[in-house]
Amino acid sequence: MTEGYIVKRFGQPVKRYVQILELKDDPESLASYRKAHSREDFWPEIKQGIQEVGILEMELYIIGTREVMIVETPLDFDWDKAMARLAQLPRQQEWENFVGRFQKCKEGDTSDEKWQMMERFFYLCED
């Protein structure tokens, strides 16, 4: 982890959203949650839907029970419209219910209800 992560370039300016979510404090649950997001087990309809609404990249980071999601999109991306559309796409609510078993949330919550948008309060470069 101390070697860092390569950042993909998209050939266009992008904007970034950062959200946080709390997971249930149970080692077995955390392992199952991570497995659900593995290349082998991640539902293809969910990946397709995420890309279909205009998301260029989505990354998940975890420490303990705290999960951070970084989403990169084109500059003209409208978060509220995209999330409303995503919620209607095939298997999306089924996925939310499935992963909700591992998350500290209410049953039936949508992705937008579970994740809290974070505020950027510092950046090093002025650009």
Where are these regions (language model features)?
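Eukaryote-biased recognition of C-terminal alpha-helical segments
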Residues: 114-122
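Short amphipathic alpha-helical segments
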Residues: 29-54
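Short beta-strand
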Residues: 58-63
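Acidic, low-complexity proline/glycine-rich segments
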Residues: 1-13
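An amphipathic, aromatic/His-enriched active-site/gating alpha helix that lines ligand/cofactor pockets
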Residues: 53, 73-114
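Short, charged/polar surface micro-motifs in flexible loops or helix N-caps
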Residues: 26-27, 67, 74-79
